[in-house]
Amino acid sequence: RLQQTRSEDVFQAYINAFAMTYDPHTNYLSPDSAENFDINMSLSLEGIGAVLQSDNEHVKVVRLVPAGPAEKSKQISPADKIVGVGQGDDEIVDVIGWRLDEVVKLIRGPKGSKVRLEVIPASNAPNDMTSKVVSITREAVKLEEQAAKKSILKLEQGGRPYKLGIIEVPAFYLDFKAFRAGDPDYKSTTRDVKKLITELQADKVDGIVIDLRNNGGGSLQEATELTGLFIDKGPTVLVRNSDGRVDVLADEQDGAFYKGPMAVLVNRLSASASEIFAGAMQDYHRALILGGQTFGKGTVQTIQPLNHGELKLTLAKFYRVSGQSTQHRGVVPDLSLIHI
């Protein structure tokens, strides 16, 4: 691994070490890191729709994204090993011993373009290294498995059955590019959760639980928008800028989208935007907060494009509607359930 370290890796590590001496949340993103950050926020990419991992000197297929180009092609399967990559009709490049991120960069590409993969099928005998070449047309891939999702938990209390709707929110994502371009189908946490609530109400659930465990945050805008689904109207978070000015972000729409019983699950890894949402639900007495004390991040970052990569820069602090800061304090649950 040390031999595979590039100068770009060293530069990123050095700049981030320097930045952290001033602020733990300001960091530099190399072009590759910036691309992955954008993918995680938009939940979309252009490629073949395969999750890969390093396996000694090879790159192995872990799973295929449902309805993605790789799955639809029916030419590769989980546990197959990729040993070569070619662009269109170009010669295939041997990638044995390559870093995972470098192989991924070769496989990703504009939708409509073709990539050829030299693959050792998992169905081969243990020592059979016979390979085959497959051609896959890249497409826009939606990472739905990383989006908010729902389930229903059936319980019985006092002889009466209850149904709880569970909405797991892994991150506060927002496709900034599509949103700014006016795309009516842009991806966002709030839009997905709103749809899931509608489906759960159709299933006649008795209450809803928003699961923010291990949710490290994301878009400040989405934290505000999601809060607005559950409150009548009013401020959602206070943002204090470096010049001392305080901006009040608020839900301006009358009426809550969902008015029924609800709870919010949090743990030590619930941070930033998760703490804004959980704190607002607690301050408005809108939901019961369950779990463990949250991470304790109370700052706001913005992305500054650079000639080479991006800078995630801290520019403000945020405060709960009550005026309290979550920095180093987190959100203390109403009911502590340490082991969930």
Located regions from the model:
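A short acidic/small-residue loop/turn micro-motif
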Residues: 90, 333-334
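Amphipathic alpha-helical
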Residues: 12-36
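Conserved small/polar residues in nucleotide/adenosyl-binding loops
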Residues: 338-340
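Long, structured ligand/cofactor-binding scaffold of large enzymes
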Residues: 1-15
